[in-house]
């Protein structure tokens, strides 16, 4: 008996050790790369978007939880529910609270590493049930956790929860197929809850997997299994209604509102996908415009092929799995299937976001092949050798077409294909240490692939983010402590479009996959640089500052003594807004200056004009801004056209009969145009540039200072040339980058800032004071009207806003102010306005979730009662 317990303890200890290894090793390999390279983890969207959302989550979950429902940090103001559901609802994010704010980048790295480690654990849990040799399961779990998909998308950390849960989903489907008790409801709930986007892909694969397996049962059993699967999947989904319903509505209003162009063609030449099987098949171009990442260790690739050469496996099972595999492969490049997997939208960057399910299936087939313990014959090795040779030749002869196929990648690919063949032909099933040998070569290849892949990327320095947050938060905290009204803040530089989330202020800029299309359209018409899911403060004027309620501006403090690199704040992406220097100096900080715009309107303001639908011309920004101003205040035109001065031409000639159209004389030499403008007033001067004149067409300097002309979409925009420079020279120097330059649609404008200040001063005198007592409530003070007026706002319209005047509900105007914002009419008399944001769809979703929970509990009770009665 003692021997039995000793053996049992040893077996249990070994089993636990293997589970521990499946968790520790993938995470350790990932962490080691960043430890030895001393890289920060912030790069691309993680550094420019997700880190800001995570900072917002950390700052508000326990202190201001209602901000996770609605926030004015979200662009000009918007619901946060879909953003929460997409980016923030992973339970791993709670680990952020274990770290101080200044260690947020390091905390994110730990979260990513733990997610990778956990995906190794869950996949090992699944595969160790499928094979008698645990080291093969351990190899597969590491291959899954550090696959090409995970390495390429490690910074898209919100997708990794689905990678973790996929093996558990398939495990529960297997239990359903065996008609055993399963936790399919729980796994379905967790998938939707952690990230609805990749949850759709995971659950779609689970459904396809079920179909391939259920095919072999008799009709009666098929229906019984399918019914059980369907009921549990529906219950799990309806439990998430509190989240899925708001997401669905917001997606209809946001990203999904734009339609994709369906076609029957391919996204790229299908056979080029073969290159993504090579080691290190990843770089920045692949991230942006490349092909889906499908790398698995090459010995596993050969074993996946071996699965289809195995005679022990039933041919019907082989056929079903083969069809599923082909379907997933076709989904990588065939347009209809690409759109199907990505919810009807082409992925912007990061192609093939579902490819982790293909990787899982391939590894699963390889594990099945390994578990057959079949004696490998020559006729099976030959096709594998041909595939290996073909892959090596394809990679070698296409190295000039794909930057990632460098010499190291080619050597690694050839070496591990050779090791894979060596293992299958001479070691597998012939040596007691075959599984350990296989495990070691898999881990080695995973390390090499990780180093080659991530070595092609550039990462931001952690201290750049930390310096930004430390300094800007110092300023915004000062604002909050000294000004209790509701206002917006902006900067003439930015670290990311989502700076308001990290620095805790209400701004204008925003980068979000789910954007308000009405707001986006308005900002485009007003000249702000934007694309389909982001917009910045670049392109604004004192008119837009006043109307949008931008009361404070944060500027660099240029007068300080330069600090050490790790302490010096970077003023990246500077906005050419010279005129913000005319605002009132509020306070100097260590590295920043706070300016106050005394003419900024409150976010709710009284207007003498009624709300009418506005027609904007995207190519005429000054007209649009004038129209915006007139609709708000009723004021007159303040923009005046300025005649272009004659340019000094260097290696440039004018077109015959043309106006402001130029060509290079000698194409191989530098060509420049220099315009010298001498203002006769202290007004603010602007250059209106059409969208096709960007940093690819010209370089531009104003009084020797470089002007950033980068656009996102082809946006016409205004560039501030100078302010309060009467009698002084403003020099515009343009260097041609192409042979021809057409400035026919470019215009010079003068904004009468003195008159604007006078009119806004008078207009502001009649405005009520607006405060925000809580995240979902906005209040005015008591005020009186002698005539009927319209209360307009720069708060994006939503059905969720309830307007109350002295305790009575008011009807909102159906016609939106500036085609985007909330407005309502007020009669003469005394008023106190209260706006309450009530998330109706969230409430309906919560009711559905609660009803589903009650139904689930009752079903469970009735099942328990019937089981007890049978006993």
Task: Enumerate the language-model features and the residues they cover.
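Membrane-embedded helix bundles of polyisoprenyl
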Residues: 23-26, 113-130, 135-216, 228-248, ...
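Membrane-interface micro-motifs in multi-pass membrane enzymes
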Residues: 81-86, 105-116, 143-167, 177-178, ...
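Membrane-interface coil-to-helix junctions
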Residues: 23-123, 142-163, 244, 251-256, ...
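Extracytoplasmic/lumenal acceptor-recognition loop(s) of multi-pass membrane glycoenzymes
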Residues: 444-461, 481-550, 762, 798, ...
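Periplasmic/ER-lumenal interhelical loops and adjacent helix-loop junctions
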Residues: 52-55, 225-228, 239-310, 315-316, ...
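Active-site-proximal, structured, solvent-exposed surfaces of multi-pass membrane proteins
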Residues: 53, 636, 640-871
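Contiguous transmembrane helix-bundle modules in multi-pass membrane proteins
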Residues: 198, 345, 349-471, 830-871
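Start-transfer (signal-anchor) and selected internal transmembrane alpha helices
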Residues: 1-33, 436-438, 854-871
């Amino acid at each position: 008996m003692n021997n039995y317990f000793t053996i049992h303890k040893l077996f249990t200890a070994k089993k636990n050790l293997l589970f521990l290894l499946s968790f520790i090793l993938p995470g350790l390999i990932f962490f080691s790369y960043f430890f030895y390279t001393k890289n920060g983890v912030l790069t691309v969207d993680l550094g420019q978007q997700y880190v800001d959302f995570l900072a917002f989550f950390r700052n508000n979950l326990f202190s201001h939880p209602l901000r996770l429902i609605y926030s004015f940090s979200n662009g000009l103001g918007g619901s946060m529910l879909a953003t929460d559901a997409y980016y923030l609802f992973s339970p791993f994010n709670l680990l952020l609270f274990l770290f101080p704010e200044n260690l947020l980048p390091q905390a994110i790295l730990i979260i990513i590493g733990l997610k990778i480690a956990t995906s190794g654990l869950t996949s090992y849990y699944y595969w160790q049930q499928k094979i008698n040799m645990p080291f093969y399961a351990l190899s597969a779990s590491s291959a899954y956790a550090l696959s090409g998909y995970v390495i390429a998308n490690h910074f898209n950390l919100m997708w990794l929860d689905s990678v973790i849960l996929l093996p558990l989903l398939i495990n529960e489907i297997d239990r359903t197929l065996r008609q055993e008790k399963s936790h399919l409801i729980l796994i379905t709930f967790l998938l939707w809850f952690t990230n609805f986007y990749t949850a759709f892909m995971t659950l779609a694969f689970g459904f396809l997997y079920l179909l391939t397996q259920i095919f072999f049962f008799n009709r009666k059993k098929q229906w019984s299994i399918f019914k059980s699967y369907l009921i549990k999947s529906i219950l799990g989904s309806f439990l998430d209604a509190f989240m899925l319903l708001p997401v669905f509505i917001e997606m209809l209003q946001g990203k999904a509102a734009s339609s994709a162009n369906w076609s029957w063609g391919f996204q790229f030449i299908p056979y080029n996908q073969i290159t993504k099987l090579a080691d290190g098949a990843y770089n920045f171009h692949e991230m942006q415009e490349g092909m889906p990442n499908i790398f698995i260790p090459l010995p596993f690739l050969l074993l996946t092929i071996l699965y289809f050469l195995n005679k022990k496996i039933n041919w019907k099972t082989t056929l079903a799995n083969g069809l599923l595999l082909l379907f997933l492969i076709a989904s990588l490049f065939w347009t209809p299937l690409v759109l199907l997997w990505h919810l009807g939208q082409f992925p912007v960057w990061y192609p093939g976001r579902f490819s982790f399910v293909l990787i899982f299936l391939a590894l699963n087939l390889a594990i099945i092949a390994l578990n057959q313990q079949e004696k490998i014959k020559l006729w099976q090795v030959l096709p594998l050798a041909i595939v290996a040779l073909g892959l090596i030749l394809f990679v070698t002869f296409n190295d000039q077409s794909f930057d990632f196929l460098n010499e190291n990648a080619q050597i690694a690919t050839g070496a591990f294909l050779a090791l894979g063949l060596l293992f299958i032909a001479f070691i597998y099933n012939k040596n007691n240490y075959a599984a350990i040998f296989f495990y070691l070569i898999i881990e080695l290849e995973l390390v090499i692939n990780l180093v080659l892949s991530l070595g092609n990327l550039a990462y931001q320095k952690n201290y750049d983010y930390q310096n930004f947050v430390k300094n800007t938060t110092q300023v915004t905290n000062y604002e909050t402590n000294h000004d209790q009204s509701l206002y917006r803040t902006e900067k003439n530089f930015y670290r990311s479009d989502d700076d308001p989330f990290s620095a805790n202020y209400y701004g204008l800029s925003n980068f979000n996959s789910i954007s308000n299309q009405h707001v986006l359209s308005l900002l485009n018409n007003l000249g702000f640089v934007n694309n389909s899911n982001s917009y910045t403060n670049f392109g604004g004027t004192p008119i837009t500052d006043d109307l949008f309620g931008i009361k404070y501006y944060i500027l660099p403090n240029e007068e300080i003594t330069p600090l050490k690199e790790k302490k010096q704040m970077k003023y990246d992406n500077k906005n050419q807004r010279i005129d913000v220097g005319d605002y009132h100096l509020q306070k100097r900080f260590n590295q920043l200056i706070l300016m106050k715009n005394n003419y900024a309107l409150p976010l709710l303001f009284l207007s003498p004009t009624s709300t009418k639908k506005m027609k904007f011309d995207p190519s005429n920004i000054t007209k649009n801004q004038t129209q915006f101003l007139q609709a708000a205040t009723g004021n007159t035109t303040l923009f005046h056209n300025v005649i272009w001065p004659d340019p000094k031409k260097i290696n440039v000639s004018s077109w015959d009969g043309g106006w402001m159209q130029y060509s290079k004389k000698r194409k191989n030499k530098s060509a420049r145009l220099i315009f010298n403008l001498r203002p006769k007033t202290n007004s603010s001067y602007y250059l209106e540039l059409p969208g096709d004149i960007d940093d690819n067409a010209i370089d531009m300097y104003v009084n020797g200072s470089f002007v950033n002309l980068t656009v996102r979409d082809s946006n016409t925009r205004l560039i501030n040339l100078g302010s309060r420079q009467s009698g002084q020279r403003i020099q515009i120097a343009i260097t041609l980058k192409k042979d021809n330059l057409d400035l026919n649609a470019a215009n010079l404008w003068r904004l009468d800032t003195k008159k604007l200040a006078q009119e806004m001063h008078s207009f502001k005198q009649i405005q009520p004071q607006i405060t925000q007592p809580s995240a979902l409530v906005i209040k005015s003070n008591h005020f009186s009207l002698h005539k009927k007026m319209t209360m307009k706002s720069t708060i994006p319209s939503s059905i969720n806003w309830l307007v109350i005047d002295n305790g009575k509900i008011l009807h909102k105007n159906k016609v939106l102010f500036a085609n985007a914002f909330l407005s309502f009419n007020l009669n003469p008399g005394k008023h106190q306005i209260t706006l309450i944001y009530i998330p109706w769809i969230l409430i309906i979703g919560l009711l559905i979730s609660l009803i589903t929970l009650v139904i689930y509990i009752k079903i469970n009770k009735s099942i328990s009662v019937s089981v007890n009665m049978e006993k």
